[in-house]
């Protein structure tokens, strides 16, 4: 499954958004990928998410694949855009 979202101001919402995003992603069994400007990362990789440099206003493509892909897609999109 895929969805495109605009990243909200996650720095203001979460104390440590990178670690919290990875923790959220690790709560799902599905593979979760993030893509922006030609960069593709695994959302369960702390180093990958740090290098990705999520910022407010970024347009990110989220892709999920696996048993709980619908829940994972909704959870990650809500985390990044709510």
Predicted features and spans:
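C-terminal structural segments of small proteins and small subunits
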Residues: 6, 29, 51-82
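Compact, glycine-rich, soluble single-domain proteins
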Residues: 6-42, 47, 51-52
């Amino acid at each position: 499954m895929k969805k495109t979202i605009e990243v909200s101001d996650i720095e203001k919402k979460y104390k440590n958004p990178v670690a919290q995003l990875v923790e959220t992603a690790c709560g799902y069994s599905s593979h979760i990928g993030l893509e922006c400007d030609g960069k593709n990362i695994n959302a369960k990789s702390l180093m990958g998410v740090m290098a990705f440099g999520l910022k407010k206003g970024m347009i990110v493509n989220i892709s999920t694949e696996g048993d709980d892909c619908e829940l994972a897609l909704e959870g990650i999109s809500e985390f990044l855009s709510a």
